[in-house]
């Protein structure tokens, strides 16, 4: 088996023009694996730490030279001569070297970039596609599925400079027979939505994740214009296409209340749960992410009891891809799904452990990008290699989003029918 002979870190830019970390892992046979760490805007307070320099004279303090130095110094020294295919040992060694609960010493961005780059190098060394190597690491060799894309076509909240409080309004092509057909459906809806917004005299500028970011009369108005676009594209809402929300409610949780400032409404936890329930009764919304604040577990229990039987309730800021927090949620019957983001936890091994724990408990797992992305498409391979069944990777424009969709098209073609697209059955209800 090949050995690691060099590791290189560098500062590159993400899709928001902010620095992030890229790592190369070089093997003794000349193979190089490269990976970039993404970055979030609406972040959970318990996420692993993204190490930034804080030097206001460079990149407004957002430089990552400290994280890069940790890759080129202590992480490189630690991993030289090790086997890149032993992912668990490699990741655990970095976790031990860091020595903190949230990877604050080395930086989760440094550790993650090396973790993923090593996986890519190991896959190449074994002459395997990355998704196949991930399936092996996951203990499910040769088992794959194509994910249903959750396409974020209207952006609000922290992802846009508009008056829409809810962060993401998504369409899911659940009636498609394949991923490629689903991607086409979503793309057609996206273009019809642009026409609907133009006809209303609304902005068609896009947000961080490529969705349109108009000012709207209410959050529900976003659902109305999307419904119109679905119909104009020739699809049936509720059958061909369903809807999903990412409320990112922690971003508008103030003094124990949920403040939808864009439409001048303030709710208690139970009141906001009822508001969301009402939306699910008026529209075919089958998934809601971060419907309540990450610390409002009592509110989450209310929401789960109200609509959890029929609606996928996804914990993002709530669980932060952390098995300790997820286990607590499972034990308390809070939510029924987890959003999976590599950089919330910081290694591939811990990411796989979170997916496995969720599935064992009957929770779904949704693989996700971050709002600050790069051309790195690893999450596409993760979704297929773990048979997660769902992926969130933004809208149908911006290359940082489309790169993941294009990688999924390549994988589907390569697998040639060996990975099923399960559509509506991936969701509850």
From Swiss-Prot:
Designated name of the protein: Enolase
GO BP: glycolytic process
UniProtKB keywords: Cytoplasm, Glycolysis, Lyase, Magnesium, Metal-binding, Secreted
Domain of life according to the entry: Bacteria
Active site (record annotation): 209 (proton donor), 341 (proton acceptor)
Positions with a binding annotation for Mg(2+): 246, 289, 316
Gene source species: Pseudomonas fluorescens (strain Pf0-1)
Cofactor(s) needed for function: Mg(2+)
Pathway note: Carbohydrate degradation; glycolysis; pyruvate from D-glyceraldehyde 3-phosphate: step 4/5
Entry similarity comment: Belongs to the enolase family.
Keyword flag Heme: no
């Amino acid at each position: 088996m090949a050995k690691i002979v060099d590791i290189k870190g560098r500062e590159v830019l993400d899709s928001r023009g902010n620095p992030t970390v890229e790592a190369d892992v070089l093997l003794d046979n000349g193979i190089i694996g490269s990976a970039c760490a993404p970055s979030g805007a609406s972040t959970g307070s318990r996420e692993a730490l993204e190490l930034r320099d804080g030097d206001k004279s460079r990149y407004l303090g957002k430089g990552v030279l400290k994280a890069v130095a940790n890759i080129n110094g202590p992480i490189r020294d630690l991993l030289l001569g090790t086997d890149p295919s032993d992912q668990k040992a490699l990741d655990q060694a970095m976790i031990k070297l860091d020595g903190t609960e949230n990877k604050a010493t080395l930086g989760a961005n440094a550790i993650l970039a090396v973790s993923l780059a090593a996986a890519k190098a190991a896959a190449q060394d074994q002459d395997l596609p990355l998704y196949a190597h991930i399936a092996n690491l996951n203990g499910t060799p040769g088992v794959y599925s194509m994910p249903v894309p959750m396409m974020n076509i209207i952006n609000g909240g922290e992802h846009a400079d508009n008056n829409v409080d809810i962060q993401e309004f998504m369409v899911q092509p659940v009636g498609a027979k394949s991923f490629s057909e689903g991607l086409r459906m979503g793309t057609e809806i996206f273009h019809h939505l642009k026409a609907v917004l133009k006809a209303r005299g609304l902005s068609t500028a896009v947000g961080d994740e490529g969705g349109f970011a108009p000012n709207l009369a209410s959050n529900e108005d976003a659902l109305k214009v999307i419904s119109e676009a679905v119909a104009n594209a020739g699809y049936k809402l509720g059958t061909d296409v369903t809807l999903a929300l990412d409320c990112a409610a922690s971003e508008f949780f103030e003094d124990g209340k949920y403040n939808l400032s864009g439409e001048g409404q303030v709710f208690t936890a139970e009141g906001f749960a009822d508001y969301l329930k009402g939306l699910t009764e008026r529209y075919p919304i089958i998934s809601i992410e971060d419907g309540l604040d990450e610390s409002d577990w009592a509110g989450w229990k209310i929401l789960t009891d109200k609509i959890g039987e029929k609606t996928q309730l996804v914990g993002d800021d709530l669980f932060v891809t952390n098995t300790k927090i997820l286990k607590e949620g499972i034990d308390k019957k809070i939510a029924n799904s987890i959003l999976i983001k590599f950089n919330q936890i910081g290694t591939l091994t811990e990411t796989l452990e979170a997916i496995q724990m969720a599935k064992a408990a009957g929770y779904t797992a949704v693989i996700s990008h971050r709002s600050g992305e790069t051309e790195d498409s690893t999450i596409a391979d993760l979704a297929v290699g773990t048979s997660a069944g769902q992926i969130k990777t933004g809208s149908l424009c911006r290359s940082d989003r489309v790169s993941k969709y294009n990688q999924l098209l390549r994988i589907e073609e390569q697998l040639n029918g060996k990975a099923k697209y399960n559509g509506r059955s991936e969701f509850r209800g």
